[in-house]
Amino acid sequence: MAKTNTVQIKLVSTADTGFFYVTKKNAKAQTGKLEFRKYDPVARKHVTFKEAKIK
């Protein structure tokens, strides 16, 4: 079988609330770290989420 290109990653809130999203990315196409502005329900506002490895 062929190796899959997609890997699961964790998007961790930069507001230090401990909230995170789990998503997938294409490891070959996206070589850098992902960074999104998404809603953090703990902080109740949109903040930057940065990519981290799932342990």
Curated annotation (Swiss-Prot):
Q: Return the NCBIfam families for the record.
A: PRK00595.1, rpmG_bact
Q: Which SUPFAM superfamilies match?
A: Zn-binding ribosomal proteins
| InterPro entries, A to Z | Ribosomal_bL33 (IPR001705), Ribosomal_bL33_CS (IPR018264), Ribosomal_bL33_sf (IPR038584), Ribosomal_zn-bd (IPR011332)
A Pfam family this protein belongs to?
Ribosomal_L33
UniProt name for this protein: Large ribosomal subunit protein bL33
One GO biological-process annotation of the entry reads: translation
Query: Which PANTHER family does the UniProt entry name for this protein?
Result: 54S RIBOSOMAL PROTEIN L39, MITOCHONDRIAL, LARGE RIBOSOMAL SUBUNIT PROTEIN BL33M
The organism that produces this protein has a lineage beginning with: Bacteria, Pseudomonadati, Pseudomonadota, Alphaproteobacteria, Acetobacterales
Identify the GO cellular component terms for this protein: cytosolic large ribosomal subunit
An example molecular function term from Gene Ontology annotations: structural constituent of ribosome
Gene3D superfamilies the UniProt entry points to = Ribosomal protein L33
**What species does this protein belong to?**
Acidiphilium cryptum (strain JF-5)
Q: Which UniProt keywords apply?
A: Ribonucleoprotein, Ribosomal protein
* This protein's record includes keyword Ribonucleoprotein: yes
* Similarity-based family: Belongs to the bacterial ribosomal protein bL33 family.
